[in-house]
Amino acid sequence: MEEQVLPELDVAELELQAVIGFNGHVPNGLKCHPDQEHLIYPLGCTVLIQAINTNEQNFLHGHGNNVSCVTISKEGDYIASGQVTFMGFKADIILWDFKKRELIARLSLHKGKIEALAFSPNDLYLVSLGGPDDGSVVVWSIAKRDAICGSPAAGLNVGNATSVVFSRCRDEMFVTAGNGTIRVWELDLPNRKIWPTECQTGQMKRIVLSTGMADDDSFFYLGTTTGDILKMNPKTKLLADTGPVKDKFSLGVSALRCLKMGGLLVGSGAGLLIFCKSPSYKPIKKVQLQGGITSITLRGEGHQFFVGTEESHIYRVNFTDFKETLIATCHFEAVQDIVFPFGTAELFATCAKKDIRVWHTMSKRELLRITVPNMTCHGIDFMRDGKSIISAWDDGKIRAFAPESGRLMYTINSAHRIGVTAIATTSDCKRIISGGGEGEVRVWQVGCQTQKLEEALKEHKSSVSCIRVKKNNEECVTASTDGTCIIWDLVRLRRNQMILANTLFQCVCYHPEEFQIITSGTDRKIAYWEVFDGSVIRELEGSLSGSINGMDITQEGGHFVTGGHDHLVKVWDYNEGEVTHVGVGHSGNIMAMRISPGNQYIVSVSADGAILRWKYPFAS
């Protein structure tokens, strides 16, 4: 992960309109603001603030790497977020002003990673926990924006502390817990020291995943990897009770919340959400969700709450009927491809591990999900008539689905030996051109009932990364990671022209007038080529720091867009070869991008599962 290199100032900025994404792997990453109107959650190196009712989004940019924890002060004035960084480098904590949506202070002491953060009940202090390479706990003064004191978080002969919870009534007491360690800390402000007391659990050895403090500080609760809950008394530092004795929570207690009315909300690693009470901890109410639960956050007193899972689902649950409503979802693995149907910008499809999803462009809603378990989809295309979605899968099959229902229409088995890596369709809807991991390009004839292999074109020596078809369906171009682009004659089914370069080609586009193509790849250069004889016209320096993975050109051919490992979306003038606009917002490597039909939006997708929609900067 390179740090983001901000572009020079003379280039205009692209306007980011919307983000579809949520990093569900961050423990307690989903937070409901005390005003009960906003959700706050991390995505890559940004923190998103989303209005619950209107879905309006604000973005907090400032971290140079992935956000690893987020917390909100009791009154809701401050947000604090911590990040991961490279081994030996300092990891920043950023303090944000919620109302102004801006950075107040950057606190850096910890190395490698910030494991957890917590505000004191009167917003006086912030306590932070460093990652495994750091192992320290630090108390910060919010007024002075400076560290008060620090200490090693755990003893010498136990594991790392991974979670921290502040007292609900006193600003001087907090609890840290982790692998074999549970400590209650007292802050001694005059001497600038924190004093730990080790809590005794007797013969029991547990790894703590989640913590929760009762409203009156009478007890705190610890969820463990074993799947049981420990109830501790912070005054006596002794174990009060533990449970459930039988039927422990599968895959551990990964999230825990205490309710004002008594009782606990418990989320397990297997996706089970439970309401239970001490000392039996037997389920009083329960509901099964999709993906291991990583966050439970209350809206107000807990009459309604939000749950975030590892599979990047955000659910709203009402306490009384304990029924879940899915309010937001996105891909939880790298998004491989994005495509618009012919002639409409109202919806688009993306594909990733396990599934293909169809989205409504304006409302960011998921309209359809097509799931194929344990497989990864490398590429998708809509047939021109809109009657099927053609997809390329890593098990070597080409699958076609109905776009309204998601029903499997047909499968082409064993289409390629080492997985299907690229796919394209002709505008007459009669042919599919596919590329495989072994380098073959295959032309398939598709009828109502039959799918027949017309020709296998064997020229490439390595996987095919991109296929584009000419408007008249008589020619196509394929880009490969063996350093060649080949222009094929689709009538006589043989090679017309070959382009060689010292790079792994990742993307290729026809200029709309179709006498030139542009290519790019791992050498960071954008090259213009003559289709007729395969000669290079010119080369541009496409990026400063990494491979270019995605490219698309407008219908008129005046501008094109690129994106890649530098996390920047760039808009280029085709004839001048100059960057006109740059979009900063991605925090993972950009995998693919498309300009919508009608040139309204640019949609880019990245390796952290995010889908970003940008306003196209020129009037069409």
UniProtKB/Swiss-Prot annotation:
GO terms for cellular component: axonemal B tubule inner sheath; axonemal microtubule; sperm flagellum; sperm midpiece. Keywords: Cell projection, Cilium, Cytoplasm, Cytoskeleton, Flagellum, Repeat, WD repeat. This is Cilia- and flagella-associated protein 52. The keyword Repeat applies. Belongs to the CFAP52 family. SMART domains: WD40. WD repeats lie at residues 62-106, 109-150, 156-195, 288-327, 330-369, 372-411, 415-454, 459-498, 500-541, 543-582, 585-620. InterPro entries: WD40/YVTN_repeat-like_dom_sf (IPR015943), WD40_repeat_CS (IPR019775), WD40_repeat_dom_sf (IPR036322), WD40_rpt (IPR001680), WD_repeat_EMAP (IPR050630). Microtubule inner protein component of sperm flagellar doublet microtubules. Interacts with BRCA2. Interacts with the CCT chaperonin complex. Interacts with HSP70. Interacts with AK8. Interacts with CFAP45. Interacts with DNAI1. Interacts with IQDC. GO terms for biological process: establishment of left/right asymmetry; flagellated sperm motility; gene expression; microtubule sliding; single fertilization; spermatid development; spermatogenesis. It comes from Mus musculus (Mouse). Signal peptide: none annotated.
